[in-house]
């Protein structure tokens, strides 16, 4: 299954990619999080917004924008107490999901 992650900023995209072992694009801000053109071949989209008010709003919009009948959309948040994926990576955080090894 072709998988793609979407994070807000460049640093968070790189950090999430390292943590999850999947390709991650940056939207360059919460206000653009639902406006990225995701290729239709992406069957699993992982939304990786910041864990703050703007990030939660961005995810709500993105869920509507990116929905396709054949696409699975997963929302992941940085572990508490981290606000974003870069903070989590720098603190030595780890993520174990199960599907990350099969990601394209």
Question: PLM features: residue spans?
Answer:
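TOPRIM fold recognition
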Residues: 1-4, 10-104
């Amino acid at each position: 299954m072709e998988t793609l992650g979407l994070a807000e900023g460049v640093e968070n995209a790189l950090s999430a990619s390292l943590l999850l072992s999947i390709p991650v694009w940056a939207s360059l801000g919460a206000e653009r999080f639902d406006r990225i053109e995701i290729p239709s071949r992406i069957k699993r989209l992982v939304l990786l917004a910041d864990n703050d008010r703007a990030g939660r709003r961005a995810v709500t919009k993105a869920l509507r924008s990116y929905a396709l009948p054949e696409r699975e959309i997963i929302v992941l948040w940085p572990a508490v107490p981290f606000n974003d994926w870069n903070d989590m990576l720098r603190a030595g955080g780890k993520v174990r999901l199960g599907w990350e090894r099969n990601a394209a």
